């Protein structure tokens, strides 16, 4: 893949990427993830903030439900933020979510940060 057609993750995208290596209870393997960080940061640093997505909805306060009709179904685990090198993790774009979902994510993580 050449630099000119390289996909750059953007806030609100759902992507697949490899979370391995991991330890303990961390989400692992090739899985869907929500992109939290803005495209400008992701492009400049080759890093991005990702939140794994799981089909196992458990009702935890940090889950953000994905609306029906998307290719990826489940919940964003907003408390599992990871900063990863997306170029080396084999990131693949799937789809983008609505502004409603993008706006709900920071609301869910605010109690962890303040």
Which ranges hold each PLM region?
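Conserved functional hotspots at enzyme active or ligand-binding sites that engage polyanionic ligands
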Residues: 1-114
């Amino acid at each position: 893949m050449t630099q000119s057609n390289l996909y750059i993750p953007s806030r609100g995208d759902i992507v697949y990427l490899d979370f391995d290596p991991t330890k303990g209870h961390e989400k692992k393997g090739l899985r869907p993830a929500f992109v939290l960080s803005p495209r400008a940061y992701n492009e400049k640093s080759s890093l991005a903030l990702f939140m794994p997505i799981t089909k196992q909805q458990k009702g935890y306060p940090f889950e953000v439900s994905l609306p029906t009709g998307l290719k990826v179904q489940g919940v964003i685990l907003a408390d599992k933020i990871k900063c990863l090198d997306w170029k080396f993790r084999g990131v693949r774009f799937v789809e983008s979510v609505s502004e409603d979902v993008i706006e709900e994510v920071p609301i869910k993580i605010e109690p962890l940060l303040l």
